[in-house]
UniProtKB/Swiss-Prot annotation:
Domain of life from the UniProt record: Bacteria
EC numbers for this chain: 4.2.1.20
Protein name: Tryptophan synthase alpha chain
Associated pathway: Amino-acid biosynthesis; L-tryptophan biosynthesis; L-tryptophan from chorismate: step 5/5
C-alpha cells in the first residue's frame, strides 16, 4: 500500500536496539503518543557515512547488543504487535541489504509492517532497480536530496515517493546551532518540482528552527537531538524501576519539538 502522509510532518529518528530492543519499542510508542507522524528507525551499521558522532555512538551500542538488519525489521513487527500504528521508515545502509538479499529484504520488511525504506548511501542515479523492487512490495524508496545542482534537484524531486527528505547542509548528521542561510532557497526549489511532501533534516534540534522552516517545507526530521536524549537517559531506561519515568521524560522532550511544528503550520 502506498505511503500516504499529510503535512505538517514531525518525523523522529531513533536507532533500533539503542540501548536495548525492548526499550526501542517503548520509545516508539512514546513518540507516537507525543505526536510523531512517521517514525524513522535506524539500522545500526559499522561504517555509517552519513552519521555524526551521536548516531555513531548509538549504532555502536546497538551493534554491541547484537542488533542486525533482520532483527531490526523483526523489531518493527514487535512494535506493531505492541500498538505502534504510525508509518515506519527503515533507514539502512546498502551493504546490509545486499548481504540479506534485496528481494528478501523487501519481503521481510513488508511482512513485519514497514512502510518505506531510506538508503542514504545509494545514489539516486543507481536507485532505479531497487525503487522498482520496492514498488513491487508496496514499499516506497524515500529519496534524499542535498543542495546540489538545480538539474539534479529536479530529477530527484520529480521522482520522489512517499515524502522527500531534504538534507539541510552537506556533511554528516548532528545537532547544529544554526541552519544555512541558503536553506530557504533550496527548499523552495525542491518544492517547485516535488509532488510529495518535503521534509528537512540534518541539524534540526530546536523549536525555533522548526518554526523558522514553516513557510518552506512540509515537515522536519529530528534525529541526533533525540538520539542524544536517549543516550542521556540510557542508564534509567535500562533500570526497570526507572524506565517508565525516563520514557515519559523522553516523550516530553519529543513533544516540545512537535508542538511548535503544529503551531507554526496552523498559522500559515
Amino acid at each position: 500500500m502506498p505511503l500516504s502522509v499529510n503535512p505538517p510532518l514531525f518525523i523522529p529518528f531513533i536507532v533500533a536496539g539503542d540501548p536495548a530492543p525492548d526499550v526501542t519499542i517503548d520509545l516508539a510508542l512514546a513518540l507516537e503518543e507525543a505526536g510523531a507522524d512517521i517514525l524513522e528507525l535506524g539500522v545500526p551499521y559499522s561504517d555509517p557515512l552519513a552519521d555524526g558522532p551521536t548516531i555513531q555512538r548509538a549504532a555502536a551500542r546497538a551493534l554491541d547488543g547484537g542488533m542486525t538488519l533482520p532483527k531490526a525489521i523483526q523489531l518493527i513487527g514487535e512494535m506493531r504487535k505492541k500498538g505502534v500504528n504510525i508509518p515506519i521508515i527503515l533507514f539502512t545502509y546498502y551493504n546490509p541489504v545486499l548481504q540479506l538479499g534485496e528481494e528478501s529484504f523487501f519481503a521481510l520488511a513488508r511482512e513485519n509492517g514497514a512502510d518505506g525504506v531510506l538508503i542514504p548511501d545509494l545514489p539516486f542515479e543507481e536507485s532505479g532497480p531497487l525503487r522498482e523492487l520496492g514498488e513491487r512490495f508496496g514499499l516506497p524508496l524515500i529519496s534524499l536530496v542535498a543542495p546540489t545542482s538545480k538539474q539534479r534537484i529536479e530529477r530527484i524531486a520529480s521522482a520522489a515517493q512517499g515524502f522527500l527528505y531534504c538534507v539541510s547542509s552537506l556533511g554528516v548528521t548532528g545537532v547544529r546551532e544554526t541552519l544555512p542561510e541558503t536553506l530557504g532557497d533550496f527548499l523552495r526549489e525542491v518544492k517547485r518540482h516535488s509532488r510529495v511532501p518535503v521534509a528537512v533534516g540534518f541539524g534540526i534540534s530546536a523549536p525555533e528552527q522548526v518554526a523558522m522552516l514553516k513557510e518552506v517545507c512540509d515537515g522536519v526530521v529530528v534525529g541526533s537531538a533525540l538520539v542524544q536524549k536517549v543516550e542521556q537517559l540510557a542508564p534509567r531506561l535500562q533500570t526497570p524501576d526507572e524506565r517508565e519515568a525516563a520514557v515519559a521524560e523522553f516523550a516530553a522532550y519529543a513533544r516540545s519539538l512537535a508542538a511548535p511544528l503544529r503551531e507554526a503550520y496552523s498559522s500559515r
